[in-house]
Structure formats: structure tokens, C-alpha cells
Amino acid sequence: MPHFYAICLTILGYCVLASCGTKSLSTTSLSQIQSDELNTRKASIVEKLKENSQLPVQERIALYHKLKKENSALYDFANETELTLYAYSFLWENNLTDAIPLFELIISEFPTSANAYDSMGEAYLQAKDSLKALQYYGKSLQMNPDNFYAEDVIQKIKFPNLKPLTAQEKFSKIYSQKDYLEDLDQLGKKLLATHPHALKFITKDQFLKNIENKKSLITEKTTYPEFAWHCNAIIASIGCSHSAASTMQNDYHLFSLLPVANSFPLQVRWVNKQLLVVNPMNNSDKVKVKDEILSINGIETANLISDISDHIVAQAHIETHKTQHFNTYFAALIPYALGLPNTFEIVVRGNNSSIKLDKAKEMATELYDPSINSCSKDLCLEILAEKTAVLTISSFNYYEWNNYPIFKSFLDSSMKVIENKKIENLIIDVRYNSGGSQYPSIYLLQHLMDKPFIYYAKAEFEGKTDKIYGEEMVHPLEKRFKGKVYFLIDGNGNSTTGHFMSLVKAHNLGTIIGEELGSNQFCTAGQTLFRLSNTKLVVSSANNTHVSTATTLPDEKGILPDFFVTQSIDDYLNKVDAVKNYALKLIEK
């Protein structure tokens, strides 16, 4: 396995989505039912090995084989990912004595897995055994020609003096027209072959026309970043939030490549169909806060934003998600949409003459809306007056194999406080929650549901051998919250947040306030990475499908609020949380 990020991408294929159902309760207690549910699921063989961590590694492996022979129905022996993470836990500690035998076990158990050989190659590379590293990386590449990481490591071992292009060199790199055209064709074919629902939100005819259109824009002077921008539009056209050109961890990601001097030198915000200055940066002598930009370099703002929107990936092309993305990465998106100009000239309302802006001295990207400041962490509980509490859940990124106990402990303690304080009104804020594991989502629902439910209607991914958590009946907790619930949502809500809120909507668990969520009950997730042959552009494509049981909701829209409330520009500038304030006013009525 190349590195931790790649591991996380693999995990995503196994940890997403949901489904609901009802069943009348018998006289059996809920705690007993939940215990029985746990007993019907296969136990983790890795947890069993961890329980015997005092044993030498060979004895743990012997225990593995013994249990597989004698108790194969009791333990889950099909979870390659969990076993791989277990082996990596030793590799990350540089404990090669344990790591290498465990990777050998994985290869013997999953002989057709290219990833197993890749992981062993990494272990031997860390052990400074280049010959064995080459052997295993070579085998992995042979089994999976798309394993570009193995390809790169092999090159580094064989040619240690070979240096990759710097970000600056890549930014100005020009490939041949033939290389670009071949890569555009490859991109289209790989997306159609890899993505399980590439044509759900676009026809095949239109998808192929988009590729031909981008091919017509290629010239002898097209640079790599301009080509990558074209690729963004092709990928965005399929309407999947889990597919994108390159990754943030890649040195050649478009945002990483862009020199600061080429970035847009104002902090701006797209609000209510207006592009407004919120921070002049080093151009305070030329523009002021709240100036409305009508055009940039002669391009009308509305047309510019429309073009940028076509290059932003979003589930089902949901506009609120695209807007939130723009308001975060405007400093790079504007230059790419304008063809990477050296200078920027703007026209603002009330001034007919153009204003030439000074070059940026720092990147003006803003990751979070400062007006939403109730919680500085992913998880927090705030007790307000009048028997009201705010539970902020800005991430479901808590996985059973890693940090899920943190989420569970937080929610358990928070619900205990809510019970002791006799809270009657609970505001659950899932704004900025881009998703994560189904485990925290289901556990939160168990505190809110008043009847049994199924989380997933569909969970499809390669290598699936059994039902995953959420496909069978889940029961509410005995001590669930029984007061009024209010949910705050925004366009940032993605992936698992869509599943969570779809069930909230379908089961009428409370009042929803905010803007259209950036996702819904339908999600194509997971990640398959591939690299275009000539330009080496890295692309991540979704490779699995997860759908919650809220299947009567439309797939073409995000989860809609009961009350549409958004931040105005004055709310933003004055740090007023209009969405939360609206919820509090509803509670006061």
C-alpha cells in the first residue's frame, strides 16, 4: 500500500451509506436485541489478534490459521483492508519483525490482490532491501497496471538520480497535442469503465461531446494546468462529488501548482448572485469591502461563475455545493477560468472604468465561514438558555477501525448532559460536514429514532462477501432524545451527511433549516486512482454505490430544508449566524 492516504481511499469503499425499515418490537428489551445483533455479525479476526498482542507474531499467525480452520463462521476472514491496516500499524512503528510476516499472511490469504504485493514492497523498501522491494512492486504493477505508485517507486530504485518535475516546471510544462488528445480519450474511457454510475446525470452522447469539445481547445501552446482544467470539466460533468482530477495530497494538484502571484488578489464571495469583495488584501487603495465586481478581464461575472461551476464536482450538480466550493477556492478557480492571465482588471458597480489590481502577495483562500463560529472542533456541545442545546457534528470521519470510540464517547457524554439538564430543544448542526463513516451517522440516528430502521437500501462494492453494518435492522436506544430537534444544513454537507439527512427527512425527525444540502440518499463513493499515460494527471474515480433507504426522495436534488435560510453578505461580514439564529427564533415561538 503506497501510504496512509491510499489506505484511507480503500477504506472509503467499505464505509459509506444507509437504509430504513420498521418492525414492531417484541417484549425483548432493546439492549438484548442490540446484543443479539452484534452476535449475528461476524467478529473481527484482527481484534482477536490484538487481544493476543503479547504473543510473538508467528504465534498470532498460527492462531489466525487455527481459528480459520475451527471457527471460520465466527470470524470475518474476508476483510483484507482491516488485516492490511493491522500490518501497517507495525510498519508505521518501523516494527518490520511483525509487519513483514503479516504482509506474507495477507499475500497467502489474498493471492490475487495487487495491493498485498504493493504493501510487501513498501515493507522491504523500508527495510532497505531494494531487490525484494523491486520484486514485490513489480508483481503488483504486473497485476494492476494502474498502480502508478509502484511504477514510480520502481523508477526511483532503478534510477535514483532521476528527479521529478518541480511544481514550477509542471506549471509551465507543454506536452504535445497528440499526448493531450490521447489522455483526454483515456480519461473518458477510464471514467466510463470505473465509475458505477458515470451516466446517471448525463447522457453518453453528451459526455462524449464534452470530450470532443475539450479536444478542440487543445493547441500547440496548451500548458499542463490548462489541460488539467479541461479534465476538471469532463469529470465534473458526471455529477459525482467523489470523483476529481488529482488529489489535494498530490504535488501537481491545480491549487498546489498555481503560483501565488498568479492567484486572484482579492478575497471575494459569491452571495445572492453577486460577486462581492470581502477583503481587498493588498488592493485596499483600489477597492473596498462590499464592492460588487461586474466583470474580470472583460468577462461578465455571471458568465465567469457559470464556467467555473461547470468545472466543480458536485453530487447531482447541486449548486449550493458548487457555491460553497467556489467561496473556498476562488483565488485559484478565477485564474484558471480566465486562462491563467498575468494580470487582473475588474469593473465594480458604480465605477465604469476598469481597475488593474496589484498582484497577490498571499493566497486569499478561506476554508471556513467565520460567521459560523459556535464550535472550533468537529464535535462540541453548547448549552443555551431556555432548555436548549446545540450539538455540532461537523464530521462523520470516525471509523470503527480507528477513532470511532472518540465519537461514541463524545455523543454518550453529550446525551448524558442533555438528559441531566432536561433539554427540550436540541439543535443538531451538520454544516461543513463532508461525510465519513456510517458508524457515527447510525449511532446518532439511534439517539433520535423511535422505531427500528435500516440504514442502507443498497451497498455495492467490489469484493463484498457479506452484508455491511447498516444493511440490517438497527434499533433505537432506550434512552433516546425525545424533545424537539432542529437540523442546520448547508451545501458543504456531502457523502454520509446526505445519507444521515435523507433519513432525518424521510422519518420526519425534526425541522430542517438552511440551504439545499450538497448531497442526498444516493452516493457513489470509494476511490479508484488512475493516472493518464502521457501527462501523468492523477484522477480519482468513485467505484462503489451506497444508497440510504430514503429512496422516495429525488436523486437529482440535495436534501431540502423546511425553512430556506442563508447568510447574507452583512451576516458574513458581521459574523452573524443567521441560520442558527433562525432556529432559535423558531424555538422561542
Identify the role of each PLM range.
Residues A18-S19:
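C-terminal motif of bacterial Sec signal peptides marking the signal peptidase cleavage site
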Residues I106, K139-S140:
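Canonical positions in the second alpha-helix
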Residues F159-N425, Y432-S434, I454-Y456, G526-R531, ...:
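Flexible, low-complexity junctional segments that flank or bridge functional domains
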Residues G435-K484, L488, N492, G526-R531, ...:
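Gly/Ser/Thr-rich loop/hinge elements
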